[in-house]
């Protein structure tokens, strides 16, 4: 057995659980005193008179200490068991007392009192020379020490009361005229502060002045001895402000508020408890000014409590929302007396109300808009972190109307309080927030939101920028979008100006004004500089391009739609460039450590543009354009080649024809491929039935009219395909038979074929009454020659793959 284990130590299993307990303050002092004699104990260990055999015999019946042996009470108290490791035979109690007397360890309370005593001495010395700058600095230092003492439950030290009386007497005794401006300013500041603090500690000051000597001999005033500010002491680990609501009537609202303000930002402060205490204090407010200050303090505390979370919990978000709404209600009721503004001057003392301006209004420094910004951001974060396919997402989305109401209400308040020359600049942020909630919606949805928002808005407010007369027509909605975007376009910030244009283009394209939206985008030249913009702006631009393409398709402008979407759909990361990937995916693949930057790359699910709809629109346009051209090319007609992307119908048909098994259509892509095959055969009815069975068409607001226009266009393109395929076999074509075959009027048949003959320079002509088309035999290849040409091409490709070196020669 090792000699490091003492013979007298007896292991007790019942005491093993206490080994993990934290040391009390008294035990820590004993442990620190024992550590002072460690050096002497080590020496005495090696000079121990006991023999090695003694250790062996002692250890024969001993049990091991265990991992926490140094926490044992025998070790800390210096008992017989286990102390041979630290103490030799010559160790005595007198040695321990001598070592302990060499170093005095002061407690935190003693250190704090010493600092106050030092400041008191400096104030005494400064009084002799009328050095009010030093007096003010030391007095402020003592005040801060009092706050620290109350936070640690030390009460109100007597030395603090002495310093207050000392400075108060010095102010009263100072009758000399002070010429130095800095000293005079320090004197006036000290006079105001000591007056304020004296009023808070009237009882203690009166007791001190009755008998200063006996008062100084007494112990410090404890927390539970007086109803002073010490009752609001903050503990070492958590904030204990539960007594504010019951005792603020004795000490006043602002002294209690100062404790809350001093507690903010400190370590180990429970923000939830702090918010609850501030909420309780709010119930004791009496004047509108106190309520405004209380809300301006409470709301940031609520928002700060969730800074380390992915988003603010919904119950806390709703509590913050109610606080902001209540603050706006108070400001609305007292708009002619109190106003909260970012332009207000800083107020050194919250207890003193700011001076009224020439209109009799007292402006308080604060930012309602910042609160609304944070609420809106937290709302978006909660949507991004919620499963979009769950009922929780729909329930959370109901709060969008509430946040939009608050945004409109804030805009009305700022319009009423801000100076007219600064309104446009300062309202730009609220305009962006308002546009963010409506630009991507149809007029029907915006109308619902506007009506609900104006119902809860105060009737005393009128908006000069977006006037409301009770009727929400389409012209009113377009006017709101135009007014807000025009205001943003006047800003010097280039990002805001680009964003304003894109908002307007998106809304205009969504509401069936394709040509206006297209001209607006081209004139703005945003596309020329979009690659240098921030990612969120690039995502918005890509969304605008997609919406332009969909708008063109709704009007059956097939060529325009195909041209707009072709470049965008060539990307293999369509979901990412539209900002429609999940936040978890962005976090996993992003190199940025900033959560705000990652969230800018994502949009809530209800703002997404359905990717299936984008695919079906583009492939349908590709089908109507490329199938007739492919047929004309294979029939020997020289055509102009057009670029095609990976998602074009031409590429899809190439893969489809190479597949070994061709089953019935299952996916969206399969339905379009089978529709293309039927179109090549001239069977337009079957082709249209396959297209119509795609469920993604239901996502279009006017799907019925779009499908009707699509059917007519499909008939025309099927006619062209039929003509290119069969013109080699016929010398004459009857317009009546073609009209019956494609269910089109004869004049429409004649018009379509005449356009084809002119465009591709085909040797064909109509008779006088245009009932028959005569086709001259040209140099076009036969079907057999076409198949042979395809086989020859495949043979060449196969040879190049098998013998690549020969192919290069």
UniProtKB/Swiss-Prot annotation:
Residues 1-102 are annotated as: Disordered. GO terms for cellular component: cytoplasmic stress granule; eukaryotic 43S preinitiation complex; eukaryotic 48S preinitiation complex; eukaryotic translation initiation factor 3 complex; multi-eIF complex. InterPro entries: EIF3C, EIF3C_N_dom, PCI_dom. It is found in: Cytoplasm. Keywords: Cytoplasm, Initiation factor, Protein biosynthesis. GO terms for biological process: formation of cytoplasmic translation initiation complex. It comes from the Eukaryota. It holds the Pfam family PCI. GO terms for molecular function: RNA binding; translation initiation factor activity; translation initiation factor binding. Residues 605-780 form the PCI domain. Component of the eukaryotic translation initiation factor 3 (eIF-3) complex. Component of the eukaryotic translation initiation factor 3 (eIF-3) complex, which is involved in protein synthesis of a specialized repertoire of mRNAs and, together with other initiation factors, stimulates binding of mRNA and methionyl-tRNAi to the 40S ribosome. The eIF-3 complex specifically targets and initiates translation of a subset of mRNAs involved in cell proliferation. This is Eukaryotic translation initiation factor 3 subunit C. It comes from Vanderwaltozyma polyspora (strain ATCC 22028 / DSM 70294 / BCRC 21397 / CBS 2163 / NBRC 10782 / NRRL Y-8283 / UCD 57-17) (Kluyveromyces polysporus).
